Design a protein with these regions (language model features):
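Terminal accessory/anchoring regions of large secretory-pathway or extracellular enzymes
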Residues: 1-194
């Protein structure tokens, strides 16, 4: 069972209550801690609140799908399609948009990736250089394969770390796909030269 919510990411598994999941939805307290009196007057949030959470039951072996659903719940919907199965899309260099029917083509995506239980957590420009940095996390209890397509704008992709240091350069396969093994619960950062 997975519980996804928006806002406060605080929970506890209550083993003495058959592994019930206790989720903090709103915290508005007059004082903090059980180690003395520490007043927090600005934490008194008077008023009406709208709280959102989602309960996602899933079968054994579907942990990755459950995590995808949980993360999707926390994101606002981004729409690029008009109507149910049609979109007007202006490709680079086109003056007039063309009508696309069916799904939007992958060649117009900025970065497409796949991986069971793997979620993108960051996509940003570097602090000290012009490279882009993308970070993924593997939520699974076993290793998984992250796959992503080499786009035309990518000159080089390399492993990095959180302080943006360059490590091993990756090589795509013959179809232009990068395949990277991620260990269980691994957080992996990649630099992209453009």
């Amino acid at each position: 069972l997975l519980v996804a919510n928006r806002g406060l990411y605080e929970y506890e598994i209550l083993e003495e209550q058959e592994n019930a999941i206790a989720v903090t939805l709103l915290r508005c307290v007059a004082e903090m801690g059980d180690w003395g009196y520490f007043p927090t007057p600005k934490a008194q949030q008077l008023g009406t609140f709208c709280l959102e959470f989602e309960v996602v039951p899933y079968a054994a072996g579907e942990t990755g799908t459950a995590f995808e659903e949980g993360y999707a719940f926390q994101q606002d919907l981004t729409v690029a399609q008009a109507g149910l199965e049609r979109a007007f899309l202006r490709k680079p260099g086109q003056v007039k948009p063309e009508l696309i029917e069916g799904k939007l083509p992958l060649e117009m995506s900025f970065l497409a990736f796949e991986g069971n239980g793997i979620h993108m957590t960051a996509f940003k420009k570097g602090q000290k250089k012009d490279d882009l940095f993308v970070r993924f996390v593997n939520h699974m209890e076993q290793g998984e394969i992250l796959s992503f397509k080499k786009e035309d704008w990518m000159k080089e992709v390399y492993r990095s770390n959180v302080i943006e240091e360059k490590d091993d350069v990756l090589t795509p396969d013959a179809d232009g796909i990068y395949h990277v093994s991620l260990r269980e619960f691994e957080i992996a950062t990649f630099g992209v030269v453009r």
